[in-house]
């Protein structure tokens, strides 16, 4: 009888242990499933500072550069805060209509107190301008730091892709880039097959003239369209005198000028200017300062490309 009881106790112990093991496995699976769900809702975003984790779909976004506004707007989001240099008309010009947002100051010195008051769930900052305030921004909200001000065209595309991922809109981002590529390719097809002239854009300020070389943002747009660039260089920008410009002697010259009088106004009476091929052949064109050199987004690059064809070929 005692032997029977011992056997029964042993059997019951085994069954109890089995139940505990099964229960533990079930609990572990449930926990793992929950973990996977949370992981799926969070994304690790790699940026110029390393990596940042962004959760869910950000709704309250603050952008500190104009190309980032171009990106988020094209992805269907209106930022709650924009570093607009206190120029609401410039923002309207970029997005094509008036939008409701709060100015967070200038791109060079955004107001951290105002940014914090907006309670953002994502801040998009420039790798060059905002490097020194990155840690402060990070304390306010998840912050990604990307290239804009010093970005090439390809780096602008990379930044757009990263922003789409951060906003949980990767598929939409891919669609937008495919549409953008088609626009550029269609414009490229309009360039005459026998076009062999070279081209360059210069930024005219009160006391200086800076050429944007083949490795600059707009220089890459010229190349994408099929033009030969007049200044091939690994340095994106090259400040030149009138004498140096006359040696380069571009066939086509686009000039993006600051407000007010510029150094070009002085040059226009100089024989060196008058003898430039672009001047003699009527191939000097204005380039909108905002669209060509400040906005630096995918939509503004399309506008710039269309501007070239319209002005050079009347298309």
From Swiss-Prot:
InterPro entries: ABC_transptr_periplasmic_BD, Bact_iron-sidero_bind. GO terms for cellular component: outer membrane-bounded periplasmic space; plasma membrane. It comes from the Bacteria. A lipid is attached at residue 19 (S-diacylglycerol cysteine). Residues 1-18 form the signal peptide. Residues 60-315 form the Fe/B12 periplasmic-binding domain. CDD domains: FhuD. Residues 37-51 have a biased composition (Basic and acidic residues). It is found in: Cell membrane. The keyword Metal-binding does not apply. Pfam families: Peripla_BP_2 (PF01497). The keyword Transmembrane does not apply. Residues 27-36 have a biased composition (Low complexity). Keywords: Cell membrane, Ion transport, Iron, Iron transport, Lipoprotein, Membrane, Palmitate, Signal, Transport. The complex is composed of one ATP-binding protein (YfmF), two transmembrane proteins (YfmD and YfmE) and a solute-binding protein (YfmC). NCBIfam families: PRK11411.1. This is Fe(3+)-citrate-binding protein YfmC.
